[in-house]
A protein has these predicted regions:
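N-terminal "domain-start" segment that seeds a small globular fold
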Residues: 1-16
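Thiol-based oxidoreductase modules, predominantly thioredoxin-like and allied folds used
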Residues: 4-8, 29-30, 41, 45-66
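CheY-like receiver
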Residues: 14-18, 67, 113
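Structural micro-motif
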Residues: 65, 71-83
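Local sequence-structure signature of Cys/Sec-based thiol-disulfide redox active-site neighborhoods
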Residues: 13-50
């Protein structure tokens, strides 16, 4: 499945409950100069191909001033799972205790995070 880049307005609509339909959504927050973010891209694409029932997005934090504080995370890459609707459920993936040297998050941990949240949605 393709990964769609979204802008600030789209992000705030998804996370703010303006998307009324119920969908499972995963968003990767990245930075243009973040080597871990770029290294994570092929894994993120592969995982999106494995989950046809989930919408995958990417948001460039270079245009997201103030959003880390608003959403309560620090640094990129960061991944979150959202169950959209009038009252969206938003869960951020925890930072790894032992980060993967190349991609920060371990691919298996990302898969488990999505699987667990799809089950709970």
């Amino acid at each position: 499945m393709a990964i769609t880049r979204i802008n600030r307005r789209n992000l705030l609509q998804i996370m703010g409950g303006e998307v009324k339909e119920r969908h499972n959504v995963v968003i990767k927050f990245y930075g243009q100069d973040c080597h871990l973010c770029h290294a994570l891209k092929p894994t993120y694409l592969e995982i999106s191909d494995e989950n046809n029932d989930v919408h995958f997005y990417a948001f460039n934090m270079d245009s997201g001033e103030g959003l880390e504080k608003k959403f309560g995370f620090s640094g990129v890459p960061t991944i979150c799972f959202i169950r959209t609707g009038p009252k969206p459920t938003v869960k951020f993936m925890e930072e790894p205790k032992k980060p993967h040297e190349e991609t920060w998050y371990h691919p298996t941990a990302i898969r488990m995070f999505i699987k667990e949240n799809k089950r709970d949605a």
